[in-house]
Design a protein with these regions (language model features):
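Bacterial Sec-dependent N-terminal signal peptides
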Residues: 1-23
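Short, flexible coil/linker elements and helix-boundary hinge sites characteristic
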Residues: 13, 69, 320-321
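Acidic, metal/ion-coordinating pockets
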Residues: 21-307, 349, 354-355, 359-361
Length: 366
């Protein structure tokens, strides 16, 4: 009887030892993309309340951080500097104050950002100033400084949470030259996404030995060539053709998507896209089981979360109330008077007073 008792005691201790060596880590990855200046829950163009915005997103973040704490990773996928007067005002009017977008993202504690084509469109003076104000890295593995041949921005960010190593690799659609004048991005070039991903995946594996790899790509999933030269939307191609990614966060095409695809190595990859204007979030849960620092299993699930289901953060609005008022005054400023009604509708079919007005102003200014 004594011997049996000792055996049971030994087995119990062994079980405790095994359990002590194993642990479960839960991560929450939240992605915003194509926010397009929708920082406040108010559309300064239509002068109506807006169902999206960083103010609503922050309510969601506050709630989730209470559960996940530092295991929540917040990422932005570009096209955040253009689209609303809020962005325009701090891009070109008030260039002395810290950029509002950077201040808000710092307040929300973003872990990394990514460049989008509309961020590039603001011009180097604007986006370099914004990047310089951000407390987090803005990534761009395929944005190359032509004078050095090296990335103009950090290619990736390595994060460690609860013993888990997570790498975020950032890339932008390479079709910038097809849309934007070179004076906006002079000194830079934009390399193919698949070639860049293949190169950096080798480096990341060798140097960082990550447990989780996330692609943060400002590009959609419907790949096609522009002018026979640029693969504008290569996110899905990268997910399928470059083994190593666990999650590919997409953007640029303003199309909601959440699905899993199989890569060439036979591994499942979650691809997810929250569309635009801060209306939807990419909400990804990653559960890892580890033993002695090695990953035994990995479960990845994603959903698209509507931000309208969350209220506006009062703390956020209070913190950025002065900037809101500055933008409101700017867009409310009287700049002239029409002697008769004017409509944009005729411009779709022929000559119009509206287009004449724009052309006259352009000629006067230039």
């Amino acid at each position: 009887m004594k011997r049996i008792t000792l055996i049971y005691a030994w087995l119990f201790c062994l079980a405790l030892s095994v359990a002590a060596q194993e642990k479960v880590v839960k991560l929450k990855i939240v992605q915003t993309s194509d926010v397009h200046g929708n920082y406040y829950p108010y559309n300064f163009i239509t002068r109506q309340e807006w169902k999206g915005s960083l103010a609503r997103i922050y309510s969601f973040i506050e709630k989730e951080r209470r559960e996940y704490k530092d295991n929540l990773i917040l990422l932005d996928n570009g096209d955040i500097l253009q689209g609303q007067p809020t962005a325009y005002y701090y891009n070109y009017i008030d260039t002395v104050s810290p950029h509002l977008c950077a201040e808000m993202m710092n307040y929300m504690k973003y872990d990394a950002g990514n460049m989008g084509n509309h961020d590039v469109e603001t011009g180097r003076a604007v986006f370099d100033r914004w990047i310089g104000t951000c407390d987090f890295p803005v990534l761009g593995a395929n944005i190359i400084d032509t004078s050095t041949g090296k990335p103009h921005l950090p290619p990736y960010k390595m994060l460690e949470r609860d013993g888990v190593k997570i790498v975020v690799l950032g890339m932008i659609t390479p079709a910038i030259p097809a849309w934007l004048s070179e004076n906006l991005w002079r000194g830079l070039r934009f390399d193919d996404m698949e070639e860049t991903a293949r190169k950096w995946m080798k480096i990341i594996r060798a140097k960082e030995n990550p447990d989780v790899v996330i692609g943060l790509f400002h590009a959609g999933q419907d790949a096609f060539k522009m002018s026979g030269k640029y693969n504008e939307n290569a996110s899905l191609n990268v997910a399928k053709n470059i083994p190593g990614f666990d999650v590919v966060l997409m953007g640029h095409d303003h199309a909601r998507e959440c699905k899993k695809v199989m890569n060439v190595a036979g591994d499942s990859v979650l691809v997810i896209d929250p569309a635009s204007n801060g209306v939807v979030l990419s909400n990804v849960d990653i559960t890892l089981k580890l033993k002695d620092g090695k990953v035994l299993s990995k479960d990845i699930q994603g959903v698209l979360t509507e931000t309208k289901e969350y209220g506006v953060s009062e703390d956020f609005m209070k913190r950025f109330a002065p900037q809101y008022e500055a933008v409101r005054k700017f867009v409310s400023k009287k700049i002239g008077t029409f002697t008769e009604d004017i409509s944009t509708h005729p411009s779709f079919f022929g000559p119009s007073a509206f287009i004449d007005l724009i052309h006259t102003l352009q000629l006067d200014i230039t």
